[in-house]
Amino acid sequence: MAGVRQHGWRAIPAVCSEYGADTLPDRYRSDGRCLLFRQQAGISALKQELEVKTPYRAMNHPVIGVVTKADLASMEQISLVKSWLREAGAHNVLVTSAVNNNGVTELFALLHTEEGCC
């Protein structure tokens, strides 16, 4: 439909170990290793935006990394995941815990700024 943006996302499960992160399609691990979910946003843009000739246009947008459930992880685990997010291209990395309400206000503030918006 012309002039309408459609937004969607999908969660991609992965297992983290000392060797890295492995993607696990359609299954979860129960061996005690840390589970990661990388959420991937998909956007169908206006026809005019799709006609832009810049290669890999969508890949040039800023990325925000968010570490969730920080109350369940050690500082070492949080530090490791933060470094992975930075290596993956996240310009801003936030640590949040909904249980303790840590980092949630900062996340919403960042999402409502021009520079933090993806």
UniProtKB/Swiss-Prot annotation:
Entry-linked SUPFAM superfamilies: P-loop containing nucleoside triphosphate hydrolases
GO terms (BP aspect): biogenic amine metabolic process
GO terms, molecular function: ATP binding
Domain of life: Bacteria
Protein name: Uncharacterized protein YoeF
